[in-house]
Amino acid sequence: VFENTWKRPMQPFWRRCLDRVRAEHPGTLFMAEVYWNREYELQQAGFDFTFDKILYDRLLSGDAESIRAHLRATPDYQKHCVRFLENHAEQRAALRFTSPEHHRGALLITGMVPGLLLCSHGQDDGRRLHASNHANRRPPEDGSLPHREAYRDLMHLLSEPARQNGSWQILEPKGHDSPLIGCLWSLQGHHSLALVVNAGWHHANGAVQAGPLAERDCQLQHCFDPAQPSPTQMKADSLRQSGLSVSLPPWGALAYRVMQLR
């Protein structure tokens, strides 16, 4: 960037800087707010995390295929991304994601992919006004119950062992032009977590591929729906042929705890 701006050669700075700081202060983490498609470049320079505004923009637009394309990046890149729905330079998430349903679906995607999840103060309450750093206070707001419930759902998923210590993979949709975003967290000795979100503006009936879940018969337990307390059993053959089938409203989501049966 400096070379392009000032038209003169520059010595690489960040690697030397980060190495020197870490030599004196081991364990220091560095996060870069970076744009212009230079996220991977700064990760390679030694930054622990880089802002992922690409995912943020694509969640706003509701283009499911572009979201999937971004999430197909290498695991090493993904785990160094900062996922967010709001930051200091943008309107608050409750304003940018204009419906609680859009907010919830986008939130579950950002929270259930690898990387660091960044949440601002009051974001989980559905607050729409920025707090004033200069006045050291925030304007009074009532917040929003649907937003609070969405963050409560996400916190339940984040507490699961598979989400904390497992491996992640995207679950591709079955069929073309699907708005469905699917992913799976797996951890040996624990149940897996599967999430499917309709990242679109119309009702979606479809399925995502079951991936490794199709290797054996499975027992699926809904994470969000208290009206369905009993687990559902699915045969491996059915999972291979039909995948995980869903019927979801715009930005609706389903999450399952999945136990593979012997």
Residue ranges and their predicted role:
Residues 1-262:
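Active-site and adjacent substrate-binding regions of carbohydrate-active enzymes
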